[in-house]
Amino acid sequence: MNRTAKISRKTKETDITLELNLDGTGIAEIETGIGFLDHMVQSFAKHGFFDLTIKVKGDLYVDSHHTVEDTGIVLGQAIKQALDEKIGIRRYGSFLLPMDETLVLCAIDLSGRPYLNYQAQLTCEKLGYMDTELVKEFFYAISYSAGMNLHIKQMDGNNNHHIVEAMFKAFAKALDEASGIDPRIQGVLSTKGTVE
């Protein structure tokens, strides 16, 4: 089974190419033009064992909003494409990730029904050159373009870098679990017989 995706998306605001292998080893080549976002997405790929290449040319002369949001949209599209008909996947995944004083919970249902429940208390406006309010926008974009029910909750912590990094790593671990193949599952894991 080849669980890969290649996506290209060009607008007046961003030009993005992305390649994803869900069954990789964590090799990442990320170039968004935003150093902090690159670091977070590299952590996502590494801890989820996803091979991921992202090249983004965005209107950073305006601000980082379009680049962050559109990167999330394309990553969500790639996840959806790589999962194809979701045959044999576990569908659900969750992870409670500690990082020093920080504890973050992430839970996923690859149901085809998009929803984001994001609960975090970030106390600074920026991390590097990235506005912290865009962390939520990134995960919102992924959840809606992937058709994913996504819950991310900060349980503890006060260091903003640790909180956001723990979110990305917890998301990676939960997605690795949810997208994993279970040989006991015949078809899709739904009494309806379909998962969109």
Swiss-Prot record:
Instruction: Report whether Cytoplasm shows up as a keyword of the record.
Output: yes
The metabolic or biological pathway listed in the UniProt record of this protein is: Amino-acid biosynthesis; L-histidine biosynthesis; L-histidine from 5-phospho-alpha-D-ribose 1-diphosphate: step 6/9
**Can the keyword Transport be found in this entry's annotation?**
no
Q: List the Pfam families.
A: IGPD
> The organism sits in which domain of life?
Bacteria
Listed name of the protein: Imidazoleglycerol-phosphate dehydratase
Which HAMAP family did the record assign? HisB (MF_00076)
Species the sequence originates in: Lachnoclostridium phytofermentans (strain ATCC 700394 / DSM 18823 / ISDg)
Specify the enzyme's EC class, one word: lyase
The gene name on file is hisB
One GO biological process from the UniProt record? L-histidine biosynthetic process
